[in-house]
């Protein structure tokens, strides 16, 4: 190691700093505990750059180890210093090297006989404990290669995985689990890694990672019988509370005092926690009459309600308007009843965890009533050969592309449990276990252009966006079908608008040229309120579909990027972003971009470059052999 490296790292100056923050001691009065940040654990301050060169020849071996002065340390060891000998604070050289991430010194000391699991310091900890608590993944990997045991407990009863969890070192938690540590391991006080993460770490990780490893969310600790949800409430950890509720944490679990998480939230008068915990109870059917409880407990029924409500609402809006009733007061009361019904269904049965169900229901309902209108209102008025036949052919293509967009694999990146653990170990041991390329939810190395979808909760290759209108992500596996869906949907809507205008021309005694715009609008709305309602739906859908189709085609053909990449280009190092443009390494010219995206082939005249984006980890791929297209 170069000597200058020591001046740009953090150094711990004494073992008393190891226990600045409470560790794994029994917590006898959880209601009095304040949440503490893992960033303030007293391990030392960043060292500034030296303005002069010290005479290292006068340094003792502890100071030289802390600063990583390899030559001075070797000089003293060769002169007879015993590397196993603890200093006056009962701390060994291996501890000091581990806490300050001096990998070359660790290798040297172990080669000279240092004991890798020697206990030391006030907390009677191993060097691996010190490295873990400080968050040095590379040091953890190195020590475990030399046989360090992560399951050993320190003086407070914690093993390494508990320290990593409570200090938010997600990469170390992942590595320890991948190396065989039990995800539900309890410390001496009965606290699991999940409990520590819920109590100490106010971010999604490592809690999210632990949940992905199928941790037991409803275990209680040894002393208080608090579950992870109890500890999250005690700490006011709203981020983790949401994760635990999504993972199925038992909101009614009671601790040794008979208190639920909701009881603790009420004691703290935290409105956010109280509301979310009550909503979680209601979602499980508690606090409601028995009949509603049974229905609300049925997730499939709730999904059907969300899908079916738009069918009812769209029909009722048009039906009420079409009623032969002159009194708008009566119609207003009827619309009020529709609104009240929707509010009741929304509060009682809508499951907001099913993000796509309602938009998908709106799309399906709109198209259903449009087709009903087409066949029952337009069929006898329009020419079969020139209108109905093309419309039906377009509908077949629309249904096909919609079905493929909805139900096909968008490019989910899959891996077995063993593959996930192998990936974690490989990335950690090569110094690449970075959350920018590793997904802590799916536990996979993220291919280039991929992204974890928060709605679907899975990583998607060449992720474009999550589309609620098709109830699926749009990615490498279904993006072409999604474009086909937009294209044929736009034509279907155009035909619907044409049908409405033709219907008014045949059945309504008014014309735009004769009566003017406003009179024409009021006349056609009065002539057939249902038709006018369908026309408004068609115009609304035409606007967003047309805009979306144009944006998608521009991104695909002219920019060579996805929607996600365009929105987050500054986050990705491989994009060159200016105030006016985005330069993409995946942009190979308009014609080639289109051929590659749609995989066009034409009798050998051109052929696309096919890339498996589920396995592509770099921006370099063979563009020459595929050559995009060739003119013959």
From Swiss-Prot:
EC number: 2.3.1.225, 2.3.1.-
Oligomer status and interactors: Interacts (via ANK repeats) with numerous proteins (via the consensus sequence motif [VIAP]-[VIT]-x-x-Q-P). Interacts (via ANK repeats) with CLIP3. Interacts (via ANK repeats) with HTT; this interaction is inversely correlated to the length of the polyglutamine tract added to the huntingtin protein in Huntington disease. Interacts (via ANK repeats) with DNAJC5 (via C-terminus). Interacts (via ANK repeats) with MAP6. Interacts (via ANK repeats) with SNAP23. Interacts (via ANK repeats) with SNAP25. Interacts (via ANK repeats) with EVL. Interacts with SPRED1 and SPRED3.
Recorded consequence of changing residue 122 to A: Mildly decreased binding affinity for SNAP25
PTMs per UniProt: Autopalmitoylated. Autopalmitoylation has a regulatory role in ZDHHC17-mediated Mg(2+) transport.
Biological source species: Homo sapiens
Domain of life the protein comes from: Eukaryota
Membrane-protein topology: Multi-pass membrane protein
Record's protein name: Palmitoyltransferase ZDHHC17
GO molecular function, one term: palmitoyltransferase activity
Encoding gene, per UniProt annotation: ZDHHC17
Catalytic site: 467 (s-palmitoyl cysteine intermediate)
Annotated region (Necessary and sufficient for interaction with DNAJC5 and SNAP25), positions in chain: 11-305
Family as reported in the entry's similarity comment: Belongs to the DHHC palmitoyltransferase family. AKR/ZDHHC17 subfamily.
Gene Ontology CC annotation, any one: presynaptic membrane
Domain DHHC positions: 437-487
Record field: catalytic activity: L-cysteinyl-[protein] + hexadecanoyl-CoA = S-hexadecanoyl-L-cysteinyl-[protein] + CoA; L-cysteinyl-[protein] + tetradecanoyl-CoA = S-tetradecanoyl-L-cysteinyl-[protein] + CoA; L-cysteinyl-[protein] + octadecanoyl-CoA = S-octadecanoyl-L-cysteinyl-[protein] + CoA
